[in-house]
Amino acid sequence: MGYSSYLAGKWHLGGAHKSLWPLQRGFDRFYGCVAGSTRFFSPDTDQREGRGIYSGNQPVRKVTSTTDRAYYTTDAFTDHAIRFIKSGDEKKPFFLYLSYTAPHWPHQAHEEDVDKYRGKYLKGWDELRKVRHQRQMQLGLFEKGQTLSPRDEKVPAWSTLDLEKQKEMDLRMAVYAAMIDCIDQNVGKLLHVLKKREQFENTMILFLTDNGACAEGPALGRGEIHDIDKRNLETNNNYGAAWANLSSTPFRLYKHFTHEGGSATPFFIHWPSGIKPQKNWYRSQAQLIDVFPTLLEVCGVKYPESFEDRKLSPLRGISLSPSFVGKPLERSKPMFSEHENNAFMIDGKWKLVGKGV
């Protein structure tokens, strides 16, 4: 019977060649952008290649809001994903890849969401990094001895900024926080639909992000932030290394790098029917390449040695299923990764990193 397969959100793979787009690569339904990012409120006005919105293989010339507020991609991606689920064959299981562009730049958000966070960051990154680190340690997120990395040398002390600059930086972080708030709202909307359809208990949900905080551009951010209309037409405004340093607490460095600040990212699996509730922190390490073997095992599928007369390379990851019942993961080899000439090797409690190797 197989799975119905849906993609809502960004694709960011082989955008210049339509033969590599979602429908040509195994998905039944697609709504989103082929590129890695787009404007949140008006993606149909973004003329850069692949930055607009597509429904299947066809460009959407004029986007239409799916809610009672202005069109916003996070809302639209979720609502189209829900439509795919509701219109699918109820006799078939489904695979949904909901790939939000938020909180990737351009940093744009609904103003009512931004207003929730205005003023919350006026304590500045120096104080807030300490507060976050203390809370992380109190929660047991890290083991005893985890220190807070120094402030990025490119970032000035918060106390050296004048009041107007502090207010600007507070707004930049408030917009970023609002983008994540909107994700939270929409994930909640999707979960409500699954519960109403009695699919929640036996649906495995994997929530993860592809990299650490983004410090691209000037340390204090780039692009328009005060003028709302101009802000929402920007293509790359962001919050800079100053706030990315806070987002990466307690780690060093950011997206692009293989230090913990760039590669240690949030990732959780929720599956009430298959994962035993646990009371204690589980500390075995996992890597993205472990997801595929995990899904194959859960679905009872054996990875083939060949396909259409082609020999397939063996899987490099391991199944994460032992963690579902609190058992440790066992690897026969260290974990390796390379990205943009940055690399790491993890073996047990040790991590070796290379920058510009």
Predicted ranges, named:
Residues 1-6, 25-28, 90-96, 199-205, ...:
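Loop/turn elements at helix/coil->beta-strand transitions in domains of secreted/extracellular proteins
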Residues 121-151:
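Alpha-helical "lid/cap" subdomains adjacent to substrate-binding clefts that gate access
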Residues 3, 13-118, 123, 153-177:
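Formylglycine-dependent
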Residues 20-29, 33-38, 233-263, 274-284, ...:
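C-terminal cap/loop subdomain of S1 sulfatases and analogous C-terminal strand-loop tails that border
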Residues 7-18, 34-37, 96-108, 148-156, ...:
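Short, solvent-exposed turn/loop segments enriched in Gly/Ser/Thr/Pro and often Arg
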Residues 1, 81, 94-100, 176, ...:
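Beta-strand elements within well-structured catalytic alpha/beta cores of enzymes
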